[in-house]
Amino acid sequence: MSRHHSRFERDYRVGWDRREWSVNGTHGTTSICSVTSGAGGGTASSLSVRPGLLPLPVVPSRLPTPATAPAPCTTGSSEAITSLVASSASAVTTKAPGISKGDSQSQGLATSIRWGQTPINQSTPWDTDEPPSKQMRESDNPGTGPWVTTVAAGNQPTLIAHSYGVAQPPTFSPAVNVQAPVIGVTPSLPPHVGPQLPLMPGHYSLPQPPSQPLSSVVVNMPAQALYASPQPLAVSTLPGVGQVARPGPTAVGNGHMAGPLLPPPPPAQPSATLPSGAPATNGPPTTDSAHGLQMLRTIGVGKYEFTDPGHPREMLKELNQQRRAKAFTDLKIVVEGREFEVHQNVLASCSLYFKDLIQRSVQDSGQGGREKLELVLSNLQADVLELLLEFVYTGSLVIDSANAKTLLEAASKFQFHTFCKVCVSFLEKQLTASNCLGVLAMAEAMQCSELYHMAKAFALQIFPEVAAQEEILSISKDDFIAYVSNDSLNTKAEELVYETVIKWIKKDPATRTQYAAELLAVVRLPFIHPSYLLNVVDNEELIKSSEACRDLVNEAKRYHMLPHARQEMQTPRTRPRLSAGVAEVIVLVGGRQMVGMTQRSLVAVTCWNPQNNKWYPLASLPFYDREFFSVVSAGDNIYLSGGMESGVTLADVWCYMSLLDNWNLVSRMTVPRCRHNSLVYDGKIYTLGGLGVAGNVDHVERYDTITNQWEAVAPLPKAVHSAAATVCGGKIYVFGGVNEAGRAAGVLQSYVPQTNTWSFIESPMIDNKYAPAVTLNGFVFILGGAYARATTIYDPEKGNIKAGPNMNHSRQFCSAVVLDGKIYATGGIVSSEGPALGNMEAYEPTTNTWTLLPHMPCPVFRHGCVVIKKYIQSG
């Protein structure tokens, strides 16, 4: 049993008696030199590290032979090693305190020098009372090489083992009796240095003993610079010595190992000497093994998990070697007369096509996988299959522009999904304006959906650049039509699309002129500016020579000249392209703004795009100081009717044409009114009730946007103004309002357009005024008004009314719309004294909650609010 290893420091005040340590660790008296193998001789197995200790791997360096006087050695055999003795001429043997009886301290071991090793789980060396040979047993790891170094450590408690390099070989004045040609010397700390900054042990390899024995070798250890953080050192010029990285003070373990256990360092050659000025460095253990960086981590008490990331690579390498040697293969593929022998499991794991094919072949043959299968493929090139198999067995392959298409075609056909992604990723990086349409056609032909959508989106996004290339003039008619007719074609002006169509026809007029009308039909002619339409399109010879083309141009002219009839002219050509800035937007029209206690009217018209959360200005109102008007959208146009200006009730109707961004007068209403409601049913605009010249009016009329005519319909049963009106389930509903007495009218009135009849019910639950109404998911929502924050929900099927969630703000004279399945309440005023609200809030039916949204351009109330599709020019 080995002796107890104590951590306390011990002073050996006298040297040890010289004694001989045999290879097996027993004591002898015939020699004062320890025995090792000099050049290929036997090794001392007793130098193995004790259990629980991490050996200290050292890369040998070469020291010049110091100029010291030779002294005779007690043994002349090849087992002699270099002995380090004190420079003192006399050797005095004294008894050191704490040394057991019979053990004397060698005169070659200086005072305060102790044997040291480094445990695997500590960052400082622990000390032992035993010399190196007493730390071994004969049964400890027999046959182990003598490369484990004995470290002589001073008794300073602040020494920490690390590795670093120095420019010149250090020296030390104390003498140590060492066990191996490689020694490690730990310098002592200066007295003024604190223990928090550790120093490094420098490791050096002594040359083999010369033919004439030396009496002593003296190495002086100079003062060493302190360090605070790991720093890489320069690579030594010596062969076999690599770069050394100095570990930080928080390094775990002995600071010498960063990877797998290293083999013993090669012994130094006798003839090798350290060049003058060459730094001596320690090479760190390498991790570039066949298996890469291996990892061993603790997963429990007494349990460790070993991970070798390089294992799959090595397995593939071995399988590939077997494939090339046709060893253990069980599948033969014959393509174009060439035979390829592979492993069924390997190929089936990468290709769903071959997996299914192998399964069916095994079932049909009834071999049960016991005999080698043979598959003959006639729809594949042998070179392509060879490349695919190379990828399957190695995981790497060189792809270039020459083979990318054929590889992708084969990988897609045989369902090599991983390789398909590689090819798609390669081709994605190769997409340009000059080849994207060709890649698009190729992806469509081979049914590679991922590449198809990628190339399509790329080509649509850079249409102006693609239109300038020659490739677009060479694609087929069907591909050309599919490309330019797409709603997502990114173009700032439809004129560019028209010019591209004309260029494609003129590329080969003999065969393409017959498609002129078909191609012109995909151009959004109504979005071409009227002046360009009259001056350029009308004068094109291709257009003049085709009656069908002239009809398309005339349709665009009518669209510009008859804005009120656009509702009946809805075709694919009148639909704006989405990528050109067309979106469903919320438009705020006019209204009132409160500045202190003073109100003023607004003529500004703005729209909010929820896709990018931006506000855009539109054409301002063509009048000033008008209020209590009603606003409704029909198609993509906005109709503003009635109102009061300078105390005069008006019957004017203005139409905002979204395409041209301007306001135009249309036919007037037959009855002037303000504070009325307007809505759209079956393409016609209805104006309901309101406040006329002589008080409340029950008059109802509707406007035909095609004929630009108004006609009267059945009047309201109860004349009201400032009511809430909407369309739901084929009926028109009017909720509450203000009656002729100036009080809230608790009445619900409904109108059936097909029969031109009204009905009404009175209910105390309906007493709203100054509140809007909208329809969402078959329910009618009445927002704010006299109830401020309240939301009232009416179910037309059941005929009941219930309370909904309150809004975040009290809102009178607000407006509301429905967009993308949500209700948006905009602006309003808290009370008659103000303040006006400059924000919006949205109702989410799935959560039944209201959410505040970013602010509007300014606080506003008594304004109009509608939703249209707006063509917004970028920039």
From Swiss-Prot:
UniProt keyword annotation of Oxidoreductase present: no
Region (Disordered): 115-145, 248-291
GO biological process: proteasome-mediated ubiquitin-dependent protein catabolic process
Polar residues bias spans: 115-126
BTB domain mapped to chain residues: 329-401
SMART domains noted in UniProt: BACK (SM00875), BTB (SM00225), Kelch (SM00612)
Presence of keyword Repeat: yes
Keyword set, alphabetical order: Kelch repeat, Repeat
Biased composition (Basic and acidic residues): 131-140
Gene Ontology MF, one: ubiquitin-like ligase-substrate adaptor activity
Pfam families: BACK, BTB, Kelch_1, Kelch_KLHDC2_KLHL20_DRC7
CDD domains assigned: BACK_KLHL29_KBTBD9
Alphabetical list of InterPro entries matching this protein: BACK, BTB/POZ_dom, Kelch-typ_b-propeller, Kelch_1, SKP1/BTB/POZ_sf
Membrane-crossing segments per the record: none
Ranges of the Kelch repeats in the UniProt entry: 585-635, 637-683, 684-730, 732-778, 779-821, 822-870
Cellular component aspect of the GO annotation: Cul3-RING ubiquitin ligase complex; cytoplasm
PANTHER family in alphabetical order: KELCH-LIKE PROTEIN 22, LD33804P
Entry protein name: Kelch-like protein 29
Phylogenetic placement of the source organism: Eukaryota, Metazoa, Chordata, Craniata, Vertebrata
